[in-house]
Amino acid sequence: EYLNFVADMYGVSEADRKARMEALAERLDIKNALPNLISECSHGMKQKIAVIGALIHEPKLILMDEPFVGLDPIAAHELKEIMAEHCRNGGAIFFSTHVLEVAEKLCDNVAIIKNGKLIAHGTMDSVRGDGSLEQVFLELEDHKD
């Protein structure tokens, strides 16, 4: 019902919603759980449903808060693929993560926010330089206000 509610909010046709729901549910290995109530779902399943809800109306811009938390490794890999496809097709994704390696692998641009303040931003190469994003973060952490 949640996914139909989201699709209704964005005016997604019955045919499009069904096709998108089935395709995304298949990719995220949650197809058999779609008829269940959300309250019956595990945290990982709820996360997958939230991802499908974010994508069902095919937005150009997607905002995600820690989208990989609670996902099994296969679903996390598939979500990374979905995100990369979205960007290759002209979309953009803003997402938060505490796993810097994920940001390094997925992002073209990065912003580091600490205590609500933007402390570094730019292309991945310009922020990272010759080191890793983790090294940059640790250096910024060492130079506290």
Cite the ranges covered by each PLM segment.
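A short, surface-exposed alpha-helical micro-motif characterized by mixed small hydrophobic
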Residues: 103-105
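Conserved ABC ATPase signature
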Residues: 37-41
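Helical segment within the ABC ATPase nucleotide-binding domain
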Residues: 76-89
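Conserved ABC ATPase "signature" region
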Residues: 4-8, 15-33
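ABC ATPase "signature
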Residues: 121-122
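A short, proline-enriched helix->beta-strand linker immediately N-terminal to the Walker B motif
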Residues: 56-60
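Catalytic Walker B motif of ABC-type/P-loop ATPase nucleotide-binding domains
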Residues: 62-65
